[in-house]
């Protein structure tokens, strides 16, 4: 494990990284929000179905 090489790699990546534009940030936020909503909706649907089954929650 070459620590110096690893640190140089991390520094190189950080130098290439840039702040996203507002449009890019907005698009990523919308997609992430939609994903969170869908996962929550799926969990709610599973909970609702399990509540109606005999021996459910």
Curated annotation (Swiss-Prot):
It is a single-pass membrane protein. InterPro entries: Prot_translocase_SecE_dom_sf, Translocase_Sec61-g, Translocase_SecE/Sec61-g. Keywords: Cell membrane, Membrane, Protein transport, Translocation, Transmembrane, Transmembrane helix, Transport. It comes from the Archaea. GO terms for cellular component: plasma membrane. Gene3D superfamilies: Preprotein translocase SecE subunit. One of its GO terms (molecular function) is protein transmembrane transporter activity. The chain crosses the membrane at residues 33-53. It is found in: Cell membrane. GO terms for biological process: intracellular protein transmembrane transport; protein secretion; protein targeting. Belongs to the SecE/SEC61-gamma family. Component of the Sec protein translocase complex. Heterotrimer consisting of SecY (alpha), SecG (beta) and SecE (gamma) subunits. The heterotrimers can form oligomers, although 1 heterotrimer is thought to be able to translocate proteins. Interacts with the ribosome. May interact with SecDF, and other proteins may be involved. Essential subunit of the Sec protein translocation channel SecYEG. Clamps together the 2 halves of SecY. May contact the channel plug during translocation. This is Protein translocase subunit SecE. It comes from Haloferax mediterranei (strain ATCC 33500 / DSM 1411 / JCM 8866 / NBRC 14739 / NCIMB 2177 / R-4) (Halobacterium mediterranei).
């Amino acid at each position: 494990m070459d620590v110096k090489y690893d640190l140089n790699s991390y520094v190189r990546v950080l130098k290439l990284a840039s702040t996203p534009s507002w449009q890019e940030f907005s698009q990523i936020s919308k997609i992430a929000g939609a994903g969170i909503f869908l996962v929550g909706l799926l969990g709610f649907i599973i909970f609702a179905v399990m509540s109606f089954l005999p021996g459910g929650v």
